[in-house]
Amino acid sequence: MSLGGTEGSGERIKFSPLKARILMMIGPVMSAIFFGFFSCGFIYYALELGISFWLDMIRENFMFILFFIWIHMSLVESIYRMIKNNLLLNSNIQELRDCYPELEEDWQNLNDADYFDKDLQVLVYGDHLICYRTFDIAYLPECSKIDAFMKASVFRLSRFREVRRVHFSAWYLDGNESELRTDELRKFIGMNQKAHKDALFDYLRENFDYIELETFD
């Protein structure tokens, strides 16, 4: 497979909702461990040095205290996002199992998808568009529009080239939006993402011609 399409006789992908869950939790868990140790150390020294010392320090280092509070608020937000994404993952997995009973038996049946691009990490199975590393899904018969966002990484390979990855958003007829994220830890180095995205959009135009498709660079 070059720029999308069915996989044919190539190497089969091992699909794993558990792996998607682990990738989702790495960032928040590592942050929780780091800031947990930091907070424990802070409390220990506060008790050891005495409250009066820390009251004086707060008066003299007010901006530091604000930074400390902001860091922990960010941690709480990260944990909330992890819980929310896990609930969404559970819902997506259940929806796929309900629509396609064969996936209840074996997720590897996704290798028989109607459209499969392992470089872009997307496939179309039945009536669902799936980013299979994160198990984000869109139910195509109820979609009115799909946007592709060509996100640039902060790391530049050279002066004129930068690492980019594609994320998708699906808009439904009722106005709701569903984000389809590719794997955040994957680096799309040396891959013509625009060509892969165009191949996917060509397939969607041919098979789901009522969906509006748009790209944002």
Give names to the regions the model predicted.
Residues 2-21, 67-124:
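Anionic N-terminal interaction surfaces
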Residues 57, 95, 99, 199-203:
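Charge-rich, solvent-exposed alpha-helical interaction surfaces
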Residues 120-125, 138-139, 170-171:
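Short, exposed beta-strand/loop patches in secreted or surface proteins that constitute
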Residues 125, 131-132:
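Beta-strand residues in well-ordered beta-sheet regions across diverse protein folds
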Residues 129, 139-155:
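Phosphoinositide-dependent membrane-docking surfaces
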Residues 133-137:
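A structural micro-motif at secondary-structure boundaries
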Residues 150-217:
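Acidic, Ser/Thr- and proline-rich intrinsically disordered linker/docking segments
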